[in-house]
C-alpha cells in the first residue's frame, strides 16, 4: 500500500485532480500518478493524475 494513497493496490479510492500519492493504481479510478506534460501533449490526460508540471513525463513518451 502506498503510504501517500488512501487505498491498497487494487482497492477502492477517489482520485482527485491533484495527486499526492506515488503509485495510486486503484481499481475505482484505474489511473496512476505522473508529471504533467507540456500543453501540446495530447497523451497527458490519458490514464494518469497530474502531480506537477514537467517538460518530461512517462505518459508523453
From Swiss-Prot:
Residue positions binding a divalent metal cation 3: 15, 19, 24, 29
Keyword annotations from UniProtKB, A to Z: Acetylation, Metal-binding, Metal-thiolate cluster, Phosphoprotein
Modification type Phosphoserine: residues: 58
Residues annotated to bind a divalent metal cation 4: 33-34, 44, 48
One Gene Ontology term, aspect cellular component: nucleus
Binding-site list for a divalent metal cation 6: 37, 41, 44, 60
Transmembrane segments: none
Annotated SUPFAM superfamilies: Metallothionein
Sequence segments annotated as region (Beta): 1-29
Positions annotated to bind a divalent metal cation 5: 34, 36-37, 50
Residues involved in a divalent metal cation 7 binding: 50, 57, 59-60
N-acetylmethionine: residues carrying this PTM: 1
InterPro entries assigned to the protein according to its UniProt record, in alphabetical order: Metalthion_dom_sf, Metalthion_dom_sf_vert, Metalthion_vert, Metalthion_vert_metal_BS
Known role: Metallothioneins have a high content of cysteine residues that bind various heavy metals; these proteins are transcriptionally regulated by both heavy metals and glucocorticoids.
Domain commentary: Class I metallothioneins contain 2 metal-binding domains: four divalent ions are chelated within cluster A of the alpha domain and are coordinated via cysteinyl thiolate bridges to 11 cysteine ligands. Cluster B, the corresponding region within the beta domain, can ligate three divalent ions to 9 cysteines.
Protein name, UniProt field: Metallothionein-1F
Amino acid at each position: 500500500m502506498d503510504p501517500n494513497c488512501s487505498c491498497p493496490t487494487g482497492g477502492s479510492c477517489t482520485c482527485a485532480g491533484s495527486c499526492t500519492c506515488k503509485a495510486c493504481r486503484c481499481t475505482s479510478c484505474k489511473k496512476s500518478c505522473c508529471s504533467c506534460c507540456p500543453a501540446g501533449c495530447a497523451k497527458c490526460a490519458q490514464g494518469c493524475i497530474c502531480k506537477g508540471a514537467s517538460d518530461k513525463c512517462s505518459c508523453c513518451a
